[in-house]
Amino acid sequence: MSLITFKAGKLRRVPGTKLLRADPEKGYIVMNRDAYGLIHFQWAKRNDLENPEDDIIVFSSECTFEKVTECTTGRAYMLKYPSSAHSLFYWMQEASDDNDTSYAERINSYIKDQDLLDPARSDVATVSDMMEVDTVEQSEPIAQPTESSKESSEIGAPNSDEINSSEAVRNLLATISAQAGFGGSTVDLCEILKPSNLTDLLCQEGVIDRLMPYMPPDTPNNLEGVLAIVSSPQYAQALRSFSQALNSPGGVNIISALGLSLDESANPNEGGALQFLKAIARFVSRNNGSE
């Protein structure tokens, strides 16, 4: 479900300096909710909307979208992580600055109050509503690229089957958010992946069958059988050891070794176990419906 879309470009750091330079490439900032209820903050080139350069899953209150007050020559904004020195920078490409503040406020409201979003409401323009001829008028000394073609992509909403299976995943990720607080702390996988948090997910159709190849040979092929495994001391010890390995120095290398992508915008002090869970969330979201 598309939540908000508006024209914006990237601000890129000049190598070897702390200076930011506006990239003249025309783009969109898009926020949407995927089939699993995850909120994505994206930036994509206008002629390549299907492959966003930035695709960040944002959790409740972990970041803010703010105006760069130090910039006096243009309309610069940043996606800021209060617990980290890392931020992503953008510049507004709408012809008028009338809605700049409103866009920022809406982005922050979506980040902060994710559970209050009503999937049935969508009073925000989608990408396809914004395909008018661009007449960007900027006060910044930025070269304006030529529009080579008219875009025609749309961001679709999840179908009913995806919605029905998404709530369990959303609840599990909400538990991650509550446990960690996203303040640079670590999480304990034993607390996050305990049976009471997994039951709803395990009840989803097909989940048990997909887990069976990884269960001990004599495990009954039903919910009770899998719950017995995830309730066992051996499971807890394995999770504890894995959690310690992820949270150790260099533990994030385990994530890459497992074929999962790291989030470049993550707080550098964020524990490896939390980054591992976020990486799984991104993987599931991006591969939804691919099988």
Curated annotation (Swiss-Prot):
Domain Pru: 1-114
Gene Ontology molecular functions: endopeptidase activator activity; proteasome binding
Domain of life per record: Eukaryota
Quaternary structure (record): Component of the 19S proteasome regulatory particle complex. The 2 S.pombe rpn13 homologs, rpn1301 and rpn1302 are present at a 0.2-1 ratio.
Keywords: Cytoplasm, Nucleus, Proteasome
Organism listed in the record: Schizosaccharomyces pombe (strain 972 / ATCC 24843)
UniProt-listed CDD domains: PH_Rpn13
Subcellular localization(s) per the UniProt record: Cytoplasm; Nucleus
Comment field on protein domains: The Pru (pleckstrin-like receptor for ubiquitin) domain mediates interactions with rpn2 and ubiquitin.
Gene3D superfamilies linked to this entry: 1.10.2020.20, Proteasomal ubiquitin receptor Rpn13/ADRM1
Primary residence: cytoplasm
Similarity comment: family membership: Belongs to the ADRM1 family.
Residue ranges constituting the DEUBAD domain according to the UniProt record: 178-290
PANTHER family for the chain: ADHESION REGULATING MOLECULE 1 110 KDA CELL MEMBRANE GLYCOPROTEIN (PTHR12225), PROTEASOMAL UBIQUITIN RECEPTOR ADRM1 (PTHR12225:SF0)
Function of the protein: Component of the 26S proteasome, a multiprotein complex involved in the ATP-dependent degradation of ubiquitinated proteins. This complex plays a key role in the maintenance of protein homeostasis by removing misfolded or damaged proteins, which could impair cellular functions, and by removing proteins whose functions are no longer required. Therefore, the proteasome participates in numerous cellular processes, including cell cycle progression, apoptosis, or DNA damage repair. Within the complex, functions as a proteasomal ubiquitin receptor.
Region (Disordered): 135-162
GO biological process: proteasome-mediated ubiquitin-dependent protein catabolic process
Protein name: Proteasomal ubiquitin receptor ADRM1 homolog rpn1301
